[in-house]
Structure formats: C-alpha cells, structure tokens
Amino acid sequence: MGRLIVIFLPLLYQIPTWLQRLYRGVVWRMNPSSKVVYLTFDDGPIPECTPQVLDILSQYDVKATFFMVAENAVRYPLLLERVRNEGHAVGNHTYHHMRGCKHSLVDYINDIEMANQVLNTTLFRPPHGRMTSCQKRALRKQGYTICLWDVLTHDYNPNYSVEHMMKVIQRFVRNGSIITCHDSIKSKDRTLLLLPQLIQYLK
C-alpha cells in the first residue's frame, strides 16, 4: 500500500488530506495554528543555483531547509558550509538521489546512512516522495523525521510558467504549509524567477 500511495506524489500540487491520513508516520504539514510557512529545497547543493537561492533568501531575511543529495554536498562542501553558516537547516535526500521503491531496504538504508556521514541530520526526505512502507518504518526506528510536503511548486517542470505556479501556490498554501522547491539544474531558471514572488506573497 505504501508503495502505491507515494508513487503519485510528484503529480500533485497539493497532497489531499485523505492521502495524508492514509500514509501516516511522515510530516506533511507543520502546526496549522501558527502563521508560518516552511520553505524547502531539494536536490542541491550545486553552484549553478544554490548560491543564487541563498542570495535571495538573505535579501528577504528568510530561512529554509535544504534537503541535500550528499553526493553534491561532497562535491561542493563550501556550499554545504554556507547553507549552515547562514542559518538554514539541512536535510538528508540520500547520497545518490535514490528512489526507495526501486531498491532493497538494505541498499536504501545504507545509502541514507552514507549520506548522513556527510550531512549529520535527522531530517529526511525521499527523492520524488517515493519509498516503501518498510523503508519508512526502518527510518523512523532509526530516529529520522520523514518530511514530505503539502504544496509542490513543480518548478522543475518546463511546461509550467511562474505565473501558473504562483496561482496554484496562492490557492493551496495555508498556515503550516511545507512548500517544496528545487535548487537543481533542471529547475534553476524557474526557481530563481519564482522565489522572490513567492516570498513577497508569503510575507
């Protein structure tokens, strides 16, 4: 059941409440009573995008969580250091951007643990939102907080304009929302255009 549920996450802008209730044991949204929205970035750090994202966040005095592919963090250690030095949080996004549903439990956990030797964090987000139920249980048993999202920007999709993404975000964002963006090659042009507009709207 867990495998079937999460495989459709990248297709959705907002995760339906019934799906969140069905797939328990992960964080979809933070405290709805708090007037705070949580901005997250997946797939970095890379020099083509992450520094510009950090510059924009600094300009608006906004903190975010970066779910890093550890292979990238090893390649660009100064970016990992900069993210932490500027007060942002770091999460584990596996070492090799590994899709859980395509790998055994042992291989998946080993990849995450290898990543954690670099990233040193208890926050985890599965690439593409895909993992099996047994992988989820194993990670929780090891003390990881599995953080998904309730609003996905689709900034990686060239078929969506920034204007369209903003309209959808305005429709779905709410108190405690976790918004997922990407600091990746594929998304960088749209991410860097979207981010200032998104922050100005949220502020």
Annotate the PLM regions.
Residues 169-203:
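Catalytic grooves of carbohydrate-active enzymes
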